[in-house]
Amino acid sequence: MLTLARQQQRQNIRWLLCLSVLMLLALLLSLCAGEQWISPGDWFTPRGELFVWQIRLPRTLAVLLVGAALAISGAVMQALFENPLAEPGLLGVSNGAGVGLIAAVLLGQGQLPNWALGLCAIAGALIITLILLRFARRHLSTSRLLLAGVALGIICSALMTWAIYFSTSVDLRQLMYWMMGGFGGVDWRQSWLMLALIPVLLWICCQSRPMNMLALGEISARQLGLPLWFWRNVLVAATGWMVGVSVALAGAIGFIGLVIPHILRLCGLTDHRVLLPGCALAGASALLLADIVARLALAAAELPIGVVTATLGAPVFIWLLLKAGR
């Protein structure tokens, strides 16, 4: 038994090391790749200082943090709701952030600065989160809370659709691009949004013990002495914050929060002591690679990153499911 535990521990360490190396390679490639390839030896030349440090680095850091936040949010939701299909958009938090951002674009007639749009997106996500916490205070079961989140998401989606019909052509272009996700407008002015993600990411990665209990189910978690109501509220609030900030940075990006935790579980990473940091590393790597494809796929334009994540990831996910079912 002790030998098996040691073997599992070594395997977990190997997985984390491999994911760390993958993330570093993706980070390096993201800084080098673009319309002009800039090798690390040229990073400190005048051209490198402009393209790498002023343009590519803030974008790369934003992609890394958003990928980590979405993947960890998916892992938290899948444990919290005991549903492998749970992901950041399921509770309506992503759509709530979208409603806040779209309201800011329409009411501000496209004149509001980026920081104001970011605050509105975060406010929309937190409003939906507060509504969910209100439901949670009524001690609803996990399945009912999940259904409440789905209903809120549908309402927010309907509001966004109505907003598109009433928008002008300029606003419509901005809204449609946002709904497909993208990091094209990210620069150092959004650094405050990046910093807002870091403490919550680190805190959640340290909460493996309650997460492991939640993954056992509500009844088992209560029997083990976990204050279920408290942890459910805290985790929903933390997830709402991360998703709101992510939407403010890059718009709506699907697939990462759904598939990354599921893929890692299929690979044997079920302990949240390993799964949570693994999701952060794998989510960051996956979104970095998707962003590189989005930048380089077309010569004259940039693809929406949400389209890239779905196109590249869905076949891999189906293949893994078929492989696991054999």
From Swiss-Prot:
Q: Which InterPro entries match?
A: ABC_BtuC-like, ABC_transptr_BtuC, ABC_transptr_permease_BtuC
Entry GO MF terms: ABC-type vitamin B12 transporter activity; identical protein binding; transmembrane transporter activity
User: Could you identify this protein by its name?
Assistant: Vitamin B12 import system permease protein BtuC
What GO biological process, any one, is recorded here? Answer: cobalamin transport
User: What is the protein's membrane topology class?
Assistant: Multi-pass membrane protein
Family membership: Belongs to the binding-protein-dependent transport system permease family. FecCD subfamily.
Cytoplasmic topological domain residue ranges: 1-10, 82-92, 139-141, 207-228, 268-274, 325-326
Q: How does it assemble?
A: The complex is composed of two ATP-binding proteins (BtuD), two transmembrane proteins (BtuC) and a solute-binding protein (BtuF).
* Stretches in topological domain Periplasmic: 36-56, 108-113, 167-190, 250-257, 297-304
The cross-references to Pfam families, in alphabetical order and at most eight, read: FecCD (PF01032)
Q: Which GO terms describe its cellular component?
A: ATP-binding cassette (ABC) transporter complex; BtuCD complex; cobalamin transport complex; membrane; plasma membrane
List the top taxonomic levels of the source.
Bacteria, Pseudomonadati, Pseudomonadota, Gammaproteobacteria, Enterobacterales
- Family annotation (NCBIfam families): PRK03784.1
Name the source organism: Escherichia coli (strain K12)
Could you list this entry's UniProt keywords, alphabetically sorted. Cell inner membrane, Cell membrane, Membrane, Transmembrane, Transmembrane helix, Transport
Q: Which residues cross the membrane?
A: 11-35, 57-81, 93-107, 114-138, 142-166, 191-206, 229-249, 258-267, 275-296, 305-324
Q: What does this protein do?
A: Part of the ABC transporter complex BtuCDF involved in vitamin B12 import. Involved in the translocation of the substrate across the membrane.
Subcellular location(s) per record: Cell inner membrane
